[in-house]
Swiss-Prot record:
Keywords, in A-Z order: Ribonucleoprotein, Ribosomal protein, RNA-binding, rRNA-binding
Stated family: Belongs to the universal ribosomal protein uS7 family.
PANTHER family attached to this UniProt entry: RIBOSOMAL PROTEIN S7 (PTHR11205)
InterPro entries recorded: Ribosomal_uS7, Ribosomal_uS7_arc, Ribosomal_uS7_CS, Ribosomal_uS7_dom, Ribosomal_uS7_dom_sf, Ribosomal_uS7_euk/arc
Functional note: One of the primary rRNA binding proteins, it binds directly to 16S rRNA where it nucleates assembly of the head domain of the 30S subunit. Is located at the subunit interface close to the decoding center.
Record flagged with keyword rRNA-binding: yes
MF annotations from Gene Ontology: rRNA binding; structural constituent of ribosome
GO cellular component, one term: small ribosomal subunit
Quaternary structure note: Part of the 30S ribosomal subunit.
Annotated protein name in UniProt: Small ribosomal subunit protein uS7
GO biological process: translation
Amino acid sequence: MEIKLFGKWDSETVTVKDPSLKSYVSVTPVLVPHTAGRNSKKSFDKSKMNIVERLANKLMANQNNTGKKHETLAIVEEALTIIENRTKENPVQVLVDALENSGPREETTRISYGGIAFLQSVDVSPSRRLDTAFRNIALGASQSAHKNKKTVAQCLADEIIFASKADMQKSFAVRKKEEKERVAQSAR
């Protein structure tokens, strides 16, 4: 018997195109993505956590959803169903594409030298790229659902679909990525 995510989607066929993210994007087959914090003890163990669970954890960062993992997993499952209905593709593959397109490759850091502070352009580690992508996707979904008739699941599905297409006009996460990279380019 093969294990499918939420009993619906096969994650064996999912491919990560970006070579730097291959070892950090975990699409290991799990029935319910809930590890109960087992991977939070060591620094880089979060790279072993399934990406759907990491997305659910970022959605829980909102003050209204803090600690409501079951509710958040239901939102993510509904969003993945919406993505599958709209795109007719594996929604886990669409999520991986969205993460690749919304993680910044370059950003700035503040350096002070002799009492003068200036910004210096630096490359971003793959782990930070993923963390930033998850944060921006979750933030974009919750902001677009605020004072809106659409549910959070519908807004999350929209955000993931637009980010997977790298649509800068409609995706909050891709817009933030482009903004960070533009600032980093000017700081070279």
